[in-house]
Amino acid sequence: MPATCPDIAGPRMEIELITTGTELLLGRVLNTHQQWLGQRLADSGHTLSRQVTVPDNGQAIREAVQTALGRAGLVITTGGLGPTSDDITRGMIADMLARPLCRDDSIASHIESFFERRNRPMPESVLVQAQVPKGAVVFPNEHGTAPGLAIEVSPNTFHESGKPAWLLMLPGPPRELRPMVDDQALPFIKKHLPLEQAFHCRTLRSLGIGESMVEDMLLGQLKPLMDRGLDLGFCARTGQVDIRLSGSGPEMPALIAEAEATIRAAIDKQIYGTDDETIEQVVVGRLIATGETLAVAESCTGGLLGHLITNVPGASTIFAGGMLTYSNEMKQILLGVNESTLAQHGAVSKEVAVEMAEGALAVSGADHALSVTGIAGPDGGTADKPVGTVWLGLTSKGSRPLAIRKFHPYDRETFKQATVHQALEMLRRRLQKTG
């Protein structure tokens, strides 16, 4: 069923995001907050209206926050809440709103125990994070020391009508920000800034079909539902396309269900999951459900396939292990690939991919084994095997081995990502047939 939020009254408001950090503007750190927060807010029925990045400069932050409060009902800042000299957001906003900073003993205790649990000495300077603007709502940080803060700006002297607004300050590190948003900030927003009507959304995740083809196949079929209020969106990633169905109102669950049925009738084979599911989560989940195990043999992906699998909780029950065989010699020693096969066909070939998978299956005793061997570039390609060529192998107990050739003409990192996703999709389809 589509995700929903409570059907409670209240206007939809402008939301602005201010990311702070000189390192973001210098390009030393990738700013992922806008994409991630934008998606999370959209999935809950809210939409970012503006986003700006400012340096760790008090005047720049002040001007950005004041300008945003003059337009928006919710302003979110990220970063600048830590203990170092360039973490100035908390103090600057407290001064701007004439809110004195007050010590919060519960935060101080959390910071002290944070260091004690790690058996590390605590610098006294970190306790500055326990100073919060008077009247602020505190979001405890379970993954760090800087709490998130929410302040109601009422009256809002920066807005021409004095209309109240909320200001949310969130920590900068993604590993701290993301769980805080999911567990605390989004529930807070739903409570204090409710939507006019219940919002519903559903995302279908596909792999192995291009965005243009998906749109051409679906747009005409879904137009009658869109005319009745359904919002349809496509988001292309490397080798993948997300199809997002959303909207508000009592009729929307039925419209989304009808749209999903239409989409599945057209491209069900390519749909691997829904909403936030990843291909690795789907594959690991199915293996757990069937009680089967998996081994991998990697060359050009450098261990990324095993890395993605072991990122999934519960993978230890199904993952037998992985072998990283970059050189021909290691392919022979660890996987038993025949020297004659390598000499006749080359390392990037159907035959070697099959022997790698068969070797991984034999060594590990697993039920399934995946293999990848390819040319990531920028060098090493030939006319017959250009850079981007990759062979994927799959063998399973009781089944004939399978190998497929793919072509991913990207930079090395993107090549590796596309390759491991295709390998996992290869296994997913086999599991789907035998399940």
PLM regions: where:
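Proline/glycine-rich low-complexity loops and linkers
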Residues: 60-66, 70, 87-192
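Accessory alpha-helical/coil subdomains and C-terminal extensions
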Residues: 155-239, 246-248, 255-256
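Short alpha-helical segments enriched in small residues
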Residues: 253-435
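Conserved hydrophobic helix-helix packing surfaces used for dimerization/oligomerization
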Residues: 15-17, 167, 294
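Glycine-rich beta-strand-to-loop/alpha-helix junction loops that act as flexible
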Residues: 20-22, 77-85, 171-172, 248-249, ...
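Glycine-rich phosphate/diphosphate-binding loop of Rossmann-like nucleotide-binding domains
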Residues: 12-52, 56
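Glycine-rich oxoanion-binding loops at beta->alpha junctions
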Residues: 38, 42-67, 103-144, 330-367
